[in-house]
Swiss-Prot record:
Protein name per UniProt: DnaJ homolog subfamily B member 1
Single GO MF descriptor: protein-folding chaperone binding
The protein's role, per its UniProt record: Interacts with HSP70 and can stimulate its ATPase activity. Stimulates the association between HSC70 and HIP. Negatively regulates heat shock-induced HSF1 transcriptional activity during the attenuation and recovery phase period of the heat shock response. Stimulates ATP hydrolysis and the folding of unfolded proteins mediated by HSPA1A/B (in vitro).
Subunit structure of this chain's protein: Interacts with DNAJC3. Interacts with HSF1 (via transactivation domain); this interaction results in the inhibition of heat shock- and HSF1-induced transcriptional activity during the attenuation and recovery phase period of the heat shock response. Interacts with BAG3.
Gene3D superfamilies linked to this entry: DnaJ domain (1.10.287.110), Urease metallochaperone UreE, N-terminal domain (2.60.260.20)
Species annotation: Homo sapiens
């Protein structure tokens, strides 16, 4: 049975956004490993972060409410991919840093300085509700007076860094069949103290679908460098076709340049056309072939992006090789048989 994110935060289904925020504050403070040394606190802290990540996002929450964890994470109610709103495909995996989420939630401040920093900070406090001793509004800290001006209480609004773009080069064979690409990135992450920074390597997995067009963008939200003053940039991979030694791509069609002699162009020929999946198709031509002429082999191109069970065409583009010179006897014959 899948996870119940509402149960993780101690909420009932239908909880409001404010109730979700308050539940995250309460549970995150209770199980933060800096204060809770019990076995399993670290894992519980991660589960709380994942639950908040889902329930605080309207789209993820809608899918979870309809299909549960299995549908959210891609297994779907009938073994298919997770269903999003309006039937769109959606697959979720929690990649967040629970400590960074905690620090960002509290605006880069350490809430333990307020609630647990003094010797008597925990006296009379309900461990299940560390905010119970404070006159709080529905928003959390909004009505608490810590002896500072309101402007000092409110952290500066963070801005997200511009997207970081990388090329993702794929071969035509990979576009034909689909493939999985694993891209290693290095980025900076906040440590649990919310101030110091560590370098971290991460593997990003990209499922390249059949027929994807050049220029397709794959975005990994907030995987850029993180500091206490920014929202990490999105990492964006842009699909680029690798040059092919035989074919050229034209959307979902592939172009095969066929070099034939002048004699073949005039008298007819058979062209053995290779395909992306390794087959060879003999194509017979009986009519005169002009330089630059194109002929289609239907359905032998790349899969169509939206309907990959269908395919584009393989286009034969002719290049006619003319002889450097013609003997006089042959020239005489040609003059007699060729039309003016």
């Amino acid at each position: 049975m899948g996870k119940d994110y509402y149960q993780t935060l101690g909420l009932a289904r239908g909880a409001s956004d404010e109730e979700i925020k308050r539940a995250y504050r309460r549970q995150a403070l209770r199980y933060h490993p800096d204060k809770n040394k019990e076995p399993g606190a670290e894992e519980k802290f991660k589960e709380i972060a994942e639950a908040y990540d889902v329930l605080s996002d309207p789209r993820k929450r809608e899918i979870f409410d309809r299909y549960g964890e299995e549908g959210l994470k891609g297994s779907g109610p009938s073994g298919g991919s997770g269903g999003g709103a309006n039937g769109t495909s959606f697959s979720y995996t929690f990649h967040g840093d629970p400590h960074a989420m905690f620090a960002e939630f509290f605006g880069g401040r350490n809430p333990f300085d307020t609630f647990f920093g003094q010797r008597n900070g925990e006296e009379g406090m309900d461990i299940d509700d560390p905010f119970s001793g404070f006159p709080m509004g529905m928003g959390g800290f909004t009505n608490v007076n810590f002896g500072r001006s309101r402007s000092a209480q409110e952290p500066a609004r963070k801005k997200q860094d511009p997207p970081v773009t990388h090329d993702l080069r794929v071969s035509l064979e990979e576009i034909y069949s689909g493939c999985t690409k694993k891209m290693k990135i290095s980025h900076k992450r906040l440590n649990p103290d919310g101030k110091s920074i560590r370098n971290e390597d991460k593997i990003l997995t990209i499922e390249v679908k059949k027929g994807w067009k050049e220029g397709t963008k794959i975005t990994f939200p907030k995987e850029g460098d993180q500091t206490s003053n920014n929202i990490p940039a999105d990492i964006v991979f842009v699909l680029k076709d690798k040059p092919h030694n035989i074919f050229k791509r034209d959307g979902s069609d592939v172009i095969y340049p066929a070099r034939i002699s002048l004699r073949e162009a005039l008298c007819g020929c058979t062209v053995n056309v290779p395909t992306l999946d390794g087959r060879t198709i003999p194509v017979v031509f009986k009519d005169v072939i002009r330089p630059g002429m194109r002929r289609k082999v239907p359905g032998e191109g790349l899969p169509l992006p939206k309907t990959p069970e269908k395919r584009g065409d393989l286009i034969i583009e002719f290049e006619v090789i003319f002889p450097e010179r013609i003997p006089q006897t042959s020239r005489t014959v040609l003059e007699q048989v060729l039309p003016i």
